[in-house]
């Protein structure tokens, strides 16, 4: 590895880290949900500044509807970051990729509560997809885990 390549790699790594560090995440969640705290910790461990607001279940329904989250894309918590919606247990690496690529979309969702996703760690992790939610409501696989 040349010195120039090493320098460019280090610069890119620092730049990527600074993007995550500057991204502020606002989470709306039910006060009784323990897995949401696990996801919040995961995001913080990956350099995101996170604030959380506990809301009543009926308010969560309103938050999700206003954010463009449907029953097919819903999970337990809804977050706003960088002008996007992040629904559920989406890994920080996918959120960072969303911030880097900036697609014309509503945001990302890990529908349901997939075992093995951030905040849902446990035995028997299951494969799951993170969906990109387009503005017209269509979804496509953004990442598979």
Question: Residue ranges of each PLM-predicted region?
Answer:
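Conserved helix-turn-beta segment immediately C-terminal to the redox Cys motif
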Residues: 40-58
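Stable alpha-helical elements in mature extracytoplasmic
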Residues: 32, 39, 56-59, 91-95
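Thiol/selenol-based redox catalytic cores and closely related redox-interacting motifs
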Residues: 65-145
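Active-site-proximal beta-strand/loop segments in catalytic clefts of secreted hydrolases
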Residues: 28-31, 53-55, 89, 111-113
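Local sequence-structure signature of Cys/Sec-based thiol-disulfide redox active-site neighborhoods
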Residues: 22-46
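Second-shell loop/turn segments in exported
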Residues: 28-30, 49, 81-86
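Structural motif
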Residues: 59-65
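Bacterial N-terminal signal peptides
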Residues: 2-18
């Amino acid at each position: 590895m040349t010195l120039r390549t090493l320098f460019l790699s280090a610069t890119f790594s620092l730049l990527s880290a600074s993007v995550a560090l500057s991204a502020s995440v606002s989470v709306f969640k039910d006060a009784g949900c323990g897995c949401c705290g696990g996801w919040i910790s995961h995001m913080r461990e990956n350099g995101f500044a996170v604030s959380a607001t506990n809301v009543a279940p009926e308010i969560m329904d309103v938050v999700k509807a206003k954010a463009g989250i449907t029953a097919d894309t819903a999970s337990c918590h809804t977050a706003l970051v960088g002008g996007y919606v992040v629904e559920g247990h989406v890994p920080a690496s996918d959120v960072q990729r969303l911030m880097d690529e900036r697609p014309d979309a509503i945001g990302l969702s890990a529908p349901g509560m997939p075992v093995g996703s951030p905040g849902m760690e446990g035995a028997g992790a299951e494969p799951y997809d993170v969906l990109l939610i387009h503005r017209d409501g269509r979804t496509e696989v953004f990442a598979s885990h």
